[in-house]
């Protein structure tokens, strides 16, 4: 019997319930189909060593994450929840992942590890609030580079940094280089460095929280605030469609910003004010407040509970405490719910029926557009198993004509799932002829049609000639027979008569006009004229 090869991708699909639970802990939502697509088709194209079957290597995951988080049009905001979940699986592997995770390298001798202090806390697993606990550092304190907290912050990406202090010794420099190399192999710097102001240490190897957030602990143990940069806001606004034009894409962008940047309440207001219009923002806030749930888990309209969970005025939350961070987590979750609900247009099935497959559009891309139309113009979730029949029928009827006709003729169509229909449509799509083949086929069809038309014309001409020949033959035969009969009949009607012989009764002594045997009609007979002979 053959053996089935287990890969990281197949392993996650076998334990999909655990994957969704881990994603939920990260405050994100993942879908199985897109999980497979990104792992097997998208991430291998980044050329960072990601295999089609997936991997739990932290270095490769970090490189893919840097490409996904790339700001501007080169980023992939829709893939953020998936790579964050992959990273969570690799950093804190469940029992079924541990056999596939390579052991972490032991620390170098030159970097001794100190035992954790009594106040050390494990890093937070949540992806929607900042980790405010400073990490224990074994390296000696570095000379201060930035001015004190009262002075202005300097953007090291756009301005020249201030001069450093005394140069360290060669041995210290070598130790620092080795430590930096070891750290960069595990987790490269975040691509969104424009979010930070000043110099920061690279993240630790076992940290799962992004370091690009407004609130983080400075080197002196004081909480520092790092606001959004104007370039980030400008790029996000100009490189993405408006919320009214494409709410799904802008919602995915804001979701990725909430995960990677860990914004505060003020940052959220700045983000909404930049990316949304006034009317759109009010609609989002209203939908978010409708999503607030009471203690019984059902939506509530009590003003005190709604204002406590999603305040419209600046709250006095202390982000250094667990309670304050929990408030911020809930606020971001409600904000995402408001964006998703506000992005839904009024129910309009005509819009859904108007989504048809393009001439060169793949069935998978068409299905994604169709599902997006269901989410936007109907209250139904296309991922709901109860709606699979409706989505399948729309997929068949609104596919390209050649694909739709073949899908309708499938045997046992009622038992086919949506995935089966997509696979059949992909087969039909891939077997389509190329433009050159289509032109050649059309040319051959035209030539064959012309050849058939010429053959039919020749056949009709031959039939016409045969018919004309038959008619002429009949006519000639009739003429010949008539002439023959005329010749034969003339000899009988005109016998040789004597000069005084009657042509009617053949008697001599009178002519036919005076023949007494010839009937005269109602008129009386004419007086007979006697003929005088030479003897008289």
Curated annotation (Swiss-Prot):
- Locate the motif PTAP/PSAP motif: 109-112
Zinc finger (CCHC-type) locations?
Answer: 500-517
Q: Where is the composition biased (Basic and acidic residues)?
A: 449-464, 484-500, 508-517
Could you cite one Gene Ontology molecular function of this protein?
zinc ion binding
User: Which residue windows are coiled coil?
Assistant: 436-476
Region described as Disordered: spans on this chain: 108-218, 449-469, 481-500, 508-536
The record's listing under Pfam families reads: Gag_MA (PF01140), Gag_p12 (PF01141), Gag_p30 (PF02093), zf-CCHC (PF00098)
Q: Which InterPro entries match?
A: G_retro_matrix (IPR000840), G_retro_matrix_sf (IPR036946), Gag_p12 (IPR002079), Gag_P30 (IPR003036), Retrov_capsid_N (IPR008919), Retroviral_Gag-Pol_poly (IPR050462), Retrovr_matrix (IPR010999), Znf_CCHC (IPR001878)
Bias (Pro residues) occurs at 108-121
Is the keyword Membrane in the record?
yes
A GO cellular component annotation in the UniProt record: host cell plasma membrane
| Post-translational modification, as annotated | RNA-binding phosphoprotein p12 is phosphorylated on serine residues.
Please provide the Gene Ontology terms (biological process) for this protein.
viral budding via host ESCRT complex
Q: Where is this site: Cleavage?
A: 129-130, 213-214, 476-477
List the ranges annotated as motif PPXY motif: 161-164
Lipid moiety-binding residues (N-myristoyl glycine):
2
Protein name (database record): Gag polyprotein
């Amino acid at each position: 019997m053959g053996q089935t090869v287990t890969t990281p991708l197949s392993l996650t699909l076998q334990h999909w319930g655990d994957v969704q639970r881990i994603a939920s802990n990260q405050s994100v939502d993942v879908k199985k189909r897109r999980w497979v697509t990104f792992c097997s088709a998208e991430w291998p194209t980044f050329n960072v060593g990601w295999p089609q079957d997936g991997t739990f290597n932290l270095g490769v995951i970090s490189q893919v994450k840097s490409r996904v988080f790339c700001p501007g049009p080169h980023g992939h905001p829709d893939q953020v929840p998936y790579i964050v979940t992959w990273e969570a699986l690799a950093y804190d592997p469940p029992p079924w992942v541990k056999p596939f995770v390579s052991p972490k390298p032991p620390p170098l001798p030159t970097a001794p590890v100190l035992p954790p202090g009594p106040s050390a806390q494990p890093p937070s697993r949540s992806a929607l609030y900042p980790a405010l606990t400073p990490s224990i550092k074994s390296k000696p304190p570095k000379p201060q580079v930035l001015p004190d907290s009262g002075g202005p912050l300097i953007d090291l990406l756009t301005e020249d940094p201030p001069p450093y202090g005394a140069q360290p010794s060669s041995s210290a420099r070598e130790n620092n280089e080795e430590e930096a190399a070891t750290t960069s192999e595990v987790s490269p710097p975040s691509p969104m460095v424009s979010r930070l102001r000043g110099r920061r240490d690279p993240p630790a190897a076992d940290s799962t929280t992004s370091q690009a957030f407004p609130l983080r602990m400075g080197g002196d143990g004081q909480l520092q605030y790092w606001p959004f940069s104007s370039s980030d806001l400008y790029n996000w606004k100009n490189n993405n469609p408006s919320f009214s034009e494409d709410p799904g894409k802008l919602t995915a962008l804001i979701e990725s910003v909430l995960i990677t940047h860990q914004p505060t309440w003020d940052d959220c207001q700045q983000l909404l004010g930049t990316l949304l219009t006034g009317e759109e923002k009010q609609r989002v806030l209203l939908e978010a407040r409708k999503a607030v749930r009471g203690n019984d888990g059902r939506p509530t309209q009590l003003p005190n509970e709604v204002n406590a969970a999603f305040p419209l005025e600046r709250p006095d939350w202390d982000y250094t405490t667990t309670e304050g961070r929990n408030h911020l987590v809930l606020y971001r979750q409600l904000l995402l719910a408001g964006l998703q609900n506000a992005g839904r247009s009024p129910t309009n099935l005509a819009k859904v029926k108007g989504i048809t497959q393009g001439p060169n559009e793949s069935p998978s891309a068409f299905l994604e557009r169709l599902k997006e139309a269901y989410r936007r113009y109907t209250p139904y979730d296309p991922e709901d198993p109860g709606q699979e029949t409706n989505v399948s029928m729309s997929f068949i009827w609104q596919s390209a004509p050649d694909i739709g006709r073949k899908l309708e003729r499938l045997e046992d169509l009622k038992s086919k799932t949506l995935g089966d229909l997509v696979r059949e449509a992909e087969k039909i799509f891939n077997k389509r002829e190329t433009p050159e083949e289509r032109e050649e086929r059309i040319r051959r069809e035209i030539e064959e049609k012309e050849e058939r038309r010429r053959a039919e014309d020749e056949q009709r001409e031959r039939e016409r000639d045969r018919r004309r020949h038959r008619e002429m033959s009949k006519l000639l035969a009739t003429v010949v027979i008539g002439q023959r009969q005329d010749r034969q009949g003339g000899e009988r009607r005109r016998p040789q008569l004597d000069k005084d012989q009657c042509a009617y009764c053949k008697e001599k002594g009178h002519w036919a006009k005076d023949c007494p045997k010839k009937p005269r009609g109602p008129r009386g007979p004419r007086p007979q004229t006697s003929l005088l002979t030479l003897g008289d």
